């Protein structure tokens, strides 16, 4: 466990990873540590065969190939660290093949579905309704990651604290502490203005930590949790007549990108707005558009034979 703590400290100090990324590394490492303990194995004396058995164990427990790949990558990095610190001289994962998986196309909502969702939310005039309406408008207008959305600070979006004027353009720190520019539209601004009127309903003045956040709560972090927002979003989808199983904060982010591309936005611009380090990550949305075109062609008279 001591080596795991040292590795996590190194990640935090040298790679500038986000808190969520560090937690993901920690979970993978602790799961691996627990597996070794059950098998009565030492992390400094395991073999490639031991690792293959571990990978088989993960697959047998219905873990998806993508998740297994992430765990392998985490443990491989961990052993590279152990080697660099002279704790061992062998990386047992060097000859481990990554399981293959199909790169599933992201799920998106249609523009009509988005309109139905926003229409339902705009009808709820309670403070909770105003908050959810603002969060959904902001997420769909900006393509923010849900972790970025919930942790926004009041100062991030206000150009004037006294008049509470909302900025149209602001910046966020994304993955790897990389700053990027966010631009939002008038409907999102209007929803935020309405929400700010009732925001104090959610402020717990006995916990000063939550005062600085746009969406404050009594949660330990001081702002609404990702999980709570996802639950509220699915509930709103149900009342809006949508299937809650097909909606999540990430689906709204995907919908933002796909609808921009459909409207003629440049792929490089979408990459910047989403905060993707690699254009290949953004290119998946072009495959979505290709699928839509193929479906549209099915309505051609010569396609019906």
Curated annotation (Swiss-Prot):
Keywords: Cell cycle, Cell division, Chromosome partition, Cytoplasm, DNA integration, DNA recombination, DNA-binding. Residues 104-298 form the Tyr recombinase domain. Residues 1-83 form the Core-binding (CB) domain. One of its GO terms (biological process) is chromosome segregation. This is Tyrosine recombinase XerD. Belongs to the 'phage' integrase family. XerD subfamily. One of its GO terms (cellular component) is cytoplasm. It comes from the Bacteria. One of its GO terms (molecular function) is DNA binding. Pfam families: Phage_int_SAM_1, Phage_integrase. The keyword Heme does not apply. It is found in: Cytoplasm. The keyword Methyltransferase does not apply. Site-specific tyrosine recombinase, which acts by catalyzing the cutting and rejoining of the recombining DNA molecules. The XerC-XerD complex is essential to convert dimers of the bacterial chromosome into monomers to permit their segregation at cell division. It also contributes to the segregational stability of plasmids. InterPro entries: CB (IPR044068), DNA_brk_join_enz (IPR011010), Integrase-like_cat_sf (IPR013762), Integrase_catalytic (IPR002104), Integrase_recombinase_N (IPR010998), Integrase_SAM-like_N (IPR004107), Recomb_XerD (IPR011932), Tyrosine_recombinase_XerC/XerD (IPR023009). The active site is at 145, 175, 250, 253, 276, 285 (o-(3'-phospho-dna)-tyrosine intermediate). SUPFAM superfamilies: DNA breaking-rejoining enzymes. HAMAP family: Recomb_XerC_XerD, Recomb_XerD. CDD domains: INT_XerDC_C. Forms a cyclic heterotetrameric complex composed of two molecules of XerC and two molecules of XerD.
